A protein has these predicted regions:
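Short, acidic, metal-binding catalytic loop of nucleotide-sugar glycosyltransferases
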Residues: 23-33
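A conserved hydrophobic helix/loop-capping motif in glycosyltransferases and polysaccharide synthases
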Residues: 4-20, 27, 40
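A recurrent flexible, glycine/aromatic-enriched loop bordering the glycosyltransferase active site
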Residues: 143-163, 230
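A conserved acidic beta->alpha catalytic loop
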Residues: 40-50
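Non-catalytic, C-terminal membrane-associated alpha-helical segments of glycosyltransferases
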Residues: 213-214, 218-281
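A short, conserved alpha-helix in the catalytic core of glycosyltransferases
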Residues: 161-163, 167-172, 177-204
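Conserved donor NDP-sugar-binding/catalytic core segment of glycosyltransferases
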Residues: 98-134
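Short beta-strand-to-loop acidic/aromatic patch adjacent to the donor-nucleotide binding site
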Residues: 86-98
Length: 281
């Protein structure tokens, strides 16, 4: 029997969270697998925690302070799980991601095929099944099209990610320097630097709609004061965290350049958008 801890962090998305958990528990039982769910409630005010406790009493709910966001909320859940048991693997799951049937079985098979020594990632698609939204990432940032076989990737989105015990013992937890985003990308890039492998499963494992393509911090239709505020929010493009990430993985020159361009995009979003558009003959 293998034991996995499923990790989530949630904030005011009650219906999506309940659907996410329903899709997860609907897959049970799975032969030779037992799961425990650790969920960080980061200050929900919409009744999410109460609904989860009522409908899924086995879920262990941890109370955040409302300022954890994704990365630190996942970190809280992960530490609680690791403190409670020496799990064989840890499954990251976003609360807006709805697993397809046999996802757990597919992950099991991938772990066996890689001898439990690689991070396993699942791709997601939009509700219309028309495009890939999240998953493993190639060097250029693209999500590889699932073709039936395990596909090596360079890093990943944290929607569906299985971290086996072998990997956890080498890499440890998500880096708590990050508040919201970049923690998942950072974990993948650290894994590659450590010589560990990352594979995306050869079929789409779930549904998750893509977030808006233009963030508020660089959207020309948003007033400057709001853009500046959103730039520095954890779920914007916080310059210090961005610099830390870029310096760690791409060097000081790239980090300094991107620190500058992030501010230019916030200050002059229309000019930046025009600058990035391909020129026509």
């Amino acid at each position: 029997m293998k034991y996995w801890a499923v990790l989530l962090t949630v904030f005011n998305r009650k219906e999506k969270t309940l659907e996410c958990l329903s899709r997860l528990f609907d897959q049970l039982p799975v032969e030779d697998l037992q799961i425990d769910v650790f969920l960080t409630d980061d200050g929900c005010t919409d009744g999410t925690a109460e609904a989860v406790e009522n409908l899924f009493p086995s879920v262990q709910i941890l109370k955040g302070n409302g300022d954890l966001f994704w990365n630190r909320g996942m970190l809280m859940a992960w530490k609680a799980a690791a403190d409670s048991r020496d799990y064989d693997a840890y499954l990251w799951l976003n609360d807006d991601t709805f697993l397809y049937e046999e996802t757990l079985t597919s992950l099991q098979r991938a772990v066996k095929d890689t001898e439990g020594k690689a991070i396993i990632v699942g791709a997601t698609e939009d509700a219309n099944h028309s495009k890939l939204t999240y998953g493993g990432r190639l060097r250029e940032g693209m999500i590889p099209n699932p073709t039936g076989e395990l596909r090596p990737v360079e890093y990943f989105n944290g929607n569906i990610v299985l971290v086996p015990q072998f990997v956890f013992r080498q890499l440890g937890y998500l880096d708590d320097y990050f508040t919201h985003s970049k923690g998942d990308f950072d974990y993948g890039l650290r894994a590659k630097k450590a010589g560990l492998q990352i594979y995306q499963i050869g079929k789409v494992l779930g549904e998750c709609d893509e977030h808006p393509t233009i963030d508020k911090w660089c959207n020309p239709n948003v007033p400057f004061a709001q853009r500046w505020n959103m730039l520095h929010r954890p779920n914007g493009m916080p310059p210090r965290e961005t610099f830390y990430f870029e310096k760690r993985h791409y060097g000081i020159i790239v980090a300094c350049l991107h620190y500058l361009t992030v501010h230019i995009r916030c200050l002059f979003p229309k000019w930046w958008i025009r600058k990035q558009q391909p020129k026509r003959n």
